[in-house]
Design a protein with these regions (language model features):
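Conserved, structured core segments of small domains
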Residues: 1-88
Length: 88
């Protein structure tokens, strides 16, 4: 199941969350190495945009809860359709 996730961090001073933010990228690298996070890009200003390929909604829910523990944020999630499926 493919999902586009857009994070909108809480409006805190960047310096207040700098230490926690430093742990975000190493944490995300574990999901990239497993092929779960297909792409992730920082947004200009704050936040990130990611494409996840997960087995279930529950897996995505767990990932987003972990993410929010590192950087408290609101998430917009959009289910996607695999391009190969649409061409079949």
């Amino acid at each position: 199941m493919l999902f586009l996730v857009i994070s909108e961090p809480r409006p805190e001073r960047p310096s207040d969350v700098a230490k926690a933010r430093q742990g975000f990228w190493p944490w995300m690298e574990t999901y990239q190495a497993k092929g779960i996070c297909k792409h992730i890009y920082p947004r200009v200003g704050r936040g990130a945009v990611a494409i996840f390929d997960v087995e279930s909604n529950e897996v995505l829910h767990r990932i987003l809860n972990e993410w929010a523990d590192i950087i408290p944020a609101r998430f917009d999630t959009y289910p996607l359709v695999d391009l190969a499926v649409t061409k079949a």
